From Swiss-Prot:
One of its GO terms (molecular function) is L-cysteine desulfhydrase activity. Coiled coil: none annotated. Signal peptide: none annotated. The lineage of its organism: Bacteria, Pseudomonadati, Pseudomonadota, Gammaproteobacteria, Alteromonadales. Pfam families: SDH_alpha. GO terms for biological process: L-cysteine catabolic process to pyruvate. Belongs to the UPF0597 family. This is UPF0597 protein Swoo_4889.
Length: 425
């Protein structure tokens, strides 16, 4: 096995992992759980939560799993009272109704405050917990569970080494990686080295089934199913992919108590990287090995493309995640590497203008839009049709990825500020 392939496996294991609930409010829940653990109490006297603008934006409209409620305050209070500080992104997996009630009582009593803070970091959350005159501080920065500092009664007892950072940009820094090397790795590495990725199919399919069975959010998936049953839509590959991908997002954003296999801290993007690939594999009757290789293509491809821009921004990351999924679908359909590159080009050309205006129920619509673009792009690619040398789409896929990264990093910060100001008005 090539030495760099082991690094690829490490990257995937590091940032493709189960997450219960939207990861921005979950970061606050996790920080609060750790802060209370440091204090050694069960219910703190008070909580103060300071977050970056982007983390604030992505927590304003999304349900916190197990609570039936929205926002950072309930996330932090629930994490403090019923969170498992050792469970990372699944910190609220065992939350009980009684603990949620206690959390709400804390909020109603004015014991939980949430404030935006000025920081250059996109992912930033600082939680201060107080109990009987003692105080703990936990600072998360650069990743949703990346604790960079802990204090107890004003004394620093932990500071992370700079090398521990796992933010989007740093995850691929210094690694010899590109679309061609990802394709070679995914299609040639020994199966036993990557079979673990099949857990993504299991977790995200269960979430999709939940969204199809029960009512969550806007019911994008269930609405499509109703239209299929009524003969308005056909039950074809395109609509199956869009329907089942959207259903998983419905459930996730609606507070379902099932984890998603996330991708670089995003459950929706983990869903977008997984469900279209799973449905395509069923359609083409691919083997489990082919599915595993396709999921590696999709997840690692998405990680690589997203390494070119900030982890949270005004750009909806489901677009480029779906580009990676389209590449994987080409592989499942027996297409070539060149056609896989065509698929990426086509998706980015199609839907790269979609903005992120916070995590919420309507994210399921954006997930459905992106997955639809992925199928369309994949079908065009299989017919060797590709956008090339137009707009931000270069003739070379690697340059296109650089271009989209530049557009987001340099062209969209003011858009992000405007969106946050509108949402906060």
């Amino acid at each position: 096995m090539k030495p760099v392939w082991q690094k690829y496996i490490e990257i995937i294991n590091q940032v493709v992992k189960p997450a219960l609930g939207c990861t921005e409010p979950i970061a606050a829940a996790y920080g609060a759980a750790v802060a209370v653990q440091e204090l050694g109490c069960s219910v703190p006297d008070s909580l103060e939560v300071f977050v970056s603008d982007n983390l604030y934006k992505n927590s304003m409209g999304v349900f916190v799993p197990g609570t039936g409620k929205i926002g950072l305050a309930i996330a932090a209070a629930s994490g403090a009272i019923g969170g498992n500080a050792d469970a990372g992104l699944e910190v609220l997996a065992a939350i009980t109704p009684e603990q949620v009630l206690q959390a709400q009582e804390m909020i109603d009593a004015g014991k939980v405050s949430v404030k935006r803070t000025v920081t250059d970091e996109f992912i930033y959350c600082c939680v201060i917990a107080k109990f009987e005159g003692r105080e703990s501080l936990v600072k998360i920065c650069g990743g949703h569970t990346l604790i960079v500092e802990k204090q107890l009664n004003g004394k620093i007892n932990f500071i992370a080494d700079e090398s521990s950072a796992t933010s989007t940009g740093s995850i691929c820094e210094g690694v010899d990686i590109n679309i061609a090397s990802i394709y070679e790795f995914a299609t040639q590495v020994e199966l036993e080295k990557i079979a673990f990725i099949l857990q993504a199919a299991d977790l995200n399919t269960k979430l999709s089934d939940e969204g199809m069975t029960n009512s969550y959010g806007l019911e994008v998936g269930r609405t499509m199913k109703k239209s299929i049953d009524e003969g308005i839509l056909s039950n074809d590959l395109l609509n199956k992919i869009v329907m089942e991908t959207a259903a998983a997002s419905d459930a996730r954003m609606g507070g379902a108590t099932l984890p998603a296999m996330s991708n670089l801290g995003s459950g929706n993007q983990g869903i977008a990287a997984t469900i279209p690939v799973v449905i395509a594999a069923k359609h083409y009757k691919n083997s489990d090995e082919q599915l595993a290789r396709a999921l590696i293509l999709s997840h690692l491809g998405a990680i690589y493309i997203k390494s070119h821009y900030p982890p949270l921004s005004a750009f909806c990351g489901n677009t480029v995640t779906s580009a990676a999924a389209a590449m994987a679908m080409v592989y499942l359909a027996g297409g070539s590497f060149e056609q896989s590159c065509f698929a990426i080009q086509n998706v980015i050309s199609d839907s790269s203008g979609m903005v992120c205006d916070g995590a919420k129920a309507s994210c399921a619509m954006k997930v459905s839009t992106s997955s639809c673009a992925a199928v369309r792009a994949f079908l065009m690619a299989m017919n060797s049709r590709s956008v090339s040398g137009q707009g931000i789409i270069a003739k070379d896929v690697e340059q296109t990825i650089i271009n989209i990264g530049q557009m987001i990093s340099h062209g969209m910060p003011s858009t992000d500020t405007t969106i946050i100001n509108i949402m906060s008005a």
